[in-house]
A protein has these predicted regions:
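Conserved ATP-driven motor cores of ASCE-family P-loop NTPases powering translocation/secretion/packaging/pilus
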Residues: 194-196, 200-305
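P-loop NTPase motor domains
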Residues: 1-202, 217-218, 228, 286-318, ...
Length: 328
């Protein structure tokens, strides 16, 4: 939540860390709410919307009193203790900052989605089914919801396969088609999940508009670590030089034969020029990129490049679904 509601330079600053500690404390508090008999409240009464309502309707003094009254072994105590280490005159600003991050829970629909426990994240690994996660490409306010879905689904399915399935593999192949990947939201630690999902009978496809967009979303080596987990790369076309240079380098070098012709030219009506050099022709071998970046950029729309691990690149023709014989 904090990562997907932060700017490029905010994710690791003081305010974000302080808000994260308070958020963790409140989540642990709400998740473990019990009735007078000591039983956990229904799941519908222990949602993220309740966290937002606490910070929106209660003073920081009331919140602190509730958290301080918890037993020492309660999981909310440690993050709350870290929050209290901030100066007291900063507490109000931290609460306001966290409230702004959770403002999306003012929407009843968002509150309903996160409050009800009716999405079985393990179902795709048990029987064939399809989950569609549809979000706006223009409005980023709800992106952390889609990032929460995938951040929970990947490790939960992996743990289910490892601990409860025969041979450590899901009985049904589970595929993640992550179209418009950079608009899903930031997925923390996704490279580690992608590294191991094959062994659990899972697969994934990441679709991005350009590498520069991917690099902006996952700076440093993050995007490269994610890309390295895939064995096939399909290039459909691009308009940015970063992607073109990357594809050009991935295609590798080829050896070409160069033919040089030399023919002496005698100036007309020149009494002083004479040449005894004969006509000559030389052949040599040199290297060049299989496809230069400008050639990658100019690739015809009806063609695509496929890069396979351990094999030479393939230049193929695209086919629309309507061209398939069995398309209905």
């Amino acid at each position: 939540i904090v990562q997907n509601t932060s700017g490029p330079k905010e994710a690791n600053d003081f305010w974000s860390r302080a808000e994260l500690n308070l958020l963790m404390a409140l989540i642990h508090y709400v998740v473990n709410l019990r009735d007078a008999d000591g039983n956990l409240l229904p799941i519908e009464q222990r949602g993220l919307g309740d966290v937002y309502r606490m910070i929106a309707t209660e003073s920081i003094e009331e919140i602190n009193r509730k958290l301080e009254a918890l037993p020492p072994e309660h999981p909310a105590k440690y993050p709350h203790g870290l929050f209290l280490k901030a100066k007291e005159n900063l507490w109000g600003n931290i609460v306001i900052g966290l409230g702004n991050r959770l403002a999306v829970f003012q929407s009843r629909l968002v509150d309903k989605i996160t409050r009800n426990h009716d999405v079985d994240l393990l179902l795709p690994g048990k029987r064939p089914c399809v989950y569609f996660v549809i979000i706006s490409a223009q409005d980023s306010a709800y992106r952390f919801l889609s990032s929460l879905f995938f951040s929970l689904a990947l490790p939960q399915l992996s743990n289910f396969a490892r601990l409860q399935c025969a041979g450590g593999r899901l009985p049904v192949l589970t595929n993640f088609c992550l179209d418009e990947y950079c608009n899903i939201g930031y997925l923390d630690g996704v490279a580690d999940s992608l590294n191991s999902i094959r062994g659990f009978n899972m697969s994934a496809q990441i679709v991005v508009q350009s590498l520069s967009q991917w690099q902006e979303k996952y700076p440093g080596k993050e995007w490269e670590n994610q890309l390295a987990t895939f064995d096939q790369t399909l290039y459909m076309g691009c308009n940015d030089l970063t992607s073109a240079k990357y594809i050009s380098e991935k295609c590798g070098k080829v050896t070409i034969s160069v033919l040089n012709n030399q023919m002496p030219m005698m100036p007309l009506f020149s009494p002083v020029y004479s040449s005894t050099r004969p006509y000559s022709q030389t052949r040599s071998n040199t290297q060049r990129d299989l496809m230069n970046p400008d050639e990658v950029l100019r690739l015809e729309n009806r063609k695509c490049l496929v890069l396979f691990k351990g094999h030479k690149p393939a230049l193929l023709y695209k086919m629309t679904p309507e061209e398939l014989p069995d398309y209905a």
